[in-house]
Amino acid sequence: MLFEESDLLKALPEQFFAGLVAKVNAKVAEGADVINLGQGNPDQPTYDHIVEALCLSAKNPASHKYSQFRGNRPFKEAAASFYKKHYGVNLDAEREICVMGGAKIGLVELPLALMNPGDLLLLPDPGYPDYLSGVSLGRVTYETFPLTAENDFLPDLDAIPEETARRAKFIYINYPNNPTGAVATKAFYEKLVAWAKTYEVGVVSDLAYGALGYQGYENPSFLSTPGAKDVGIEFYTFSKTFNMAGWRLAFAAGNDQMIEALNLIQDHLFVGIFPALQEAGIAALLDPKSEEAVAQLNATYDSRRDAFVQAAAKIGWQAFPSRGSFYAWMPVPEGYTSESFADLLLEKVHVAVAPGKGFGPAGDAYVRIGLLVEPERLVEAVNRIANLHLFNN
């Protein structure tokens, strides 16, 4: 008997990061010393007090039962308190927060929950590749808006055709930005809220890197903008702020109608989040030790960015001056595409980077560097690349 994938699965886009990992693994299997700067996987451990909270709760038999479908109230109250303290946003813990096993789940399921086949979704180019999974699964259409260096990789809302804006159901934004490291300003968010109200477009803010700012920069939340909850929601993941990428914990916050739709689809797909994981999440959000740890984490990324960018500048390779995330967005040398340049680096000097084309056509003139190894290895990576004499060195 033969079983065939459904048409829905066949229509899914290629998993960009899976292909990247396969290339790196193949080179490592050959015995190469690969410096892997191609992924966005935090290399630092989860903070001790969070792990301890998980272990303590996991030993409690009450944690072994089914959790509340829509998240335990103490966790949602902790999320609301976190947003109030850090962003000045008031949230109703029951009506304006949705708990989920990672922000990717919510970002992918939103088109299924709030859009109909054929509805239009606006996406950034370059942008997080997995946004397209939601497009395919929801059978919606999409158009992109370019993020350019000339506009500091922020959307030019005035350049979106009026006819497109009026047809659009939702727009996704992501700041600090993956892959560019650009950040959004309060003025931009104010303009975005006004634009969304004018054209009746829902806003979906992906705040995955919200706590990560270089040289003390504090990223604003979209929800802190007056009127933001009238038009949208924001996803907050524990992966980057608390080094919990493998734990799979996140929440969405904001507009109560959008939150209700996400809760409803999750009622049918999942049976809550492991209670001990939620207790660990509470420790992450509320324990003062987290603030100290995040400050140290930002200092670590500061030193790494400085080491890489300064070494790259010495060989004539100039970085976009990112202010958030843990990435460097680097131009490819003349005569190369992002893929051909990335393939050259992996093959010739065993340095893995992420081709910008994987984030959209507008990214093809760049590669993304993950600052997720020690400064010495970052400098070594630049020194290896320097031996190819592709820049003015």
Specify the residue positions occupied by each region the protein language model found.
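Helix C-cap/helix->beta junction micro-motif
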Residues: 27-30, 138, 198-199, 315, ...
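Conserved glycine-rich beta-strand-loop-beta hairpin in the small C-terminal domain of fold type I
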Residues: 282, 298-309, 319-331, 363
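Conserved core of the PLP fold type I
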Residues: 63-194, 211-212, 219-223, 378
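PLP-dependent enzyme catalytic core of the Aspartate aminotransferase-like
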Residues: 81, 335, 344-354, 359-393
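N-terminal small-domain helix-loop-helix segment of the aminotransferase-like
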Residues: 2-101, 109, 284-287, 391-393
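A short helix->loop->beta-strand "cap" motif at the edges of active sites that frequently abuts
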Residues: 119, 140, 198-201, 229-230
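Conserved core segment of the aminotransferase class I/II
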Residues: 227-299, 306, 310, 389-390
